[in-house]
């Protein structure tokens, strides 16, 4: 058959409802909003074509390859309940389309081009199924949950953190002082803010030195292992690695990276360096809401979370759930499980479109951070369980007596909640009561409770 020039409907080639997916396929669930007059099958096929082998017209060179082997296929379409003209299009991609061990390449293929397509009014990537064969090409988190607990010698409870505020403007010496006070008071970690890199008021090397000094002083006084997330994010990959090398030379346990603004290539390089040199890696998701906030367009955070587990990170910020809507709680817990567990069953009520097997890829600790304080502690302990980091920035530094008492209040509240839970008490119902009891023998906690009057949780 000779080459037949011209434009034909995508669905003739790329919509294949009879296709049986393979174990090695990467599967994607897209929320598609077609333009008026575009049938859903065509819209689904557009997505499959433009994110794999297709282009707008038939080309002569199609005859030089086996399209059936390499093309993406839209294999199922379902309407979205309660939404007019929205569909979930399921697309299967052959594994050969992707470079091994490259999150960058995976995203460039799947979401690189198709989101600006005229036939679509809006498009959102809701979930990805990463096949075992592809998972195995990634190093993943530098260390993972178990190794981190062993390094820190901390078991049976969530870890406590605090972001140092004001985030910009402190000198390195004053910054280090705040770090020391928080760690001395009982926190496990303190944190550079995501936008603390190396600015005129505080260059990175000075900050690293003063924070390391604070860390060692607090360790000596408390007998506990302490950490400060030193933000190694920089303008170039070379500079980022240089900062990580200096952190390693100081002997600190953990560094930090802003993985979306820094980019997946830089993040994966840093994760490899961290595994090779015994550093834990804390990941901040600055810029995520630009990508994931719109319900009908962009990429859902669960996909960004999966991508981070592949690229590599030991902690990642994942929202707080507290005080949010019920549905959001289930959805958040869905991607928290995707970060921590080895094997996650498909569960649409939690937003999980595919069963995901991570084989032996280490897990990532979810970090709850943003607007939380001591009254939230029972809810956070209940919702996130032991394998999490609870971060109180203002909830530590906003204590009326200062930073160290703020840290004491948080640690006492956490220990009280963990003890109550281990005794079989119901944190959901008795949370406020547990905190009030603990106040009796901790004036620091009592003062914190007074400032942030109790919040009512309807579990």
Curated annotation (Swiss-Prot):
Pfam families: RuBisCO_large, RuBisCO_large_N. Signal peptide: none annotated. Mg(2+) binds at residues 191, 193-194. The modification N6,N6,N6-trimethyllysine is found at residue 4. Keywords: Calvin cycle, Carbon dioxide fixation, Chloroplast, Disulfide bond, Lyase, Magnesium, Metal-binding, Methylation, Monooxygenase, Oxidoreductase, Photorespiration, Photosynthesis, Plastid. Belongs to the RuBisCO large chain family. Type I subfamily. This is Ribulose bisphosphate carboxylase large chain. It catalyses: 2 (2R)-3-phosphoglycerate + 2 H(+) = D-ribulose 1,5-bisphosphate + CO2 + H2O; D-ribulose 1,5-bisphosphate + O2 = 2-phosphoglycolate + (2R)-3-phosphoglycerate + 2 H(+). The modification N6-carboxylysine is found at residue 191. Substrate binds at residues 113, 163, 167, 285, 317, 369. Binds 1 Mg(2+) ion per subunit. The record marks 324 as: Transition state stabilizer. It is found in: Plastid, Chloroplast. Its cofactor is Mg(2+). It comes from Micranthes integrifolia. The keyword Lipoprotein does not apply.
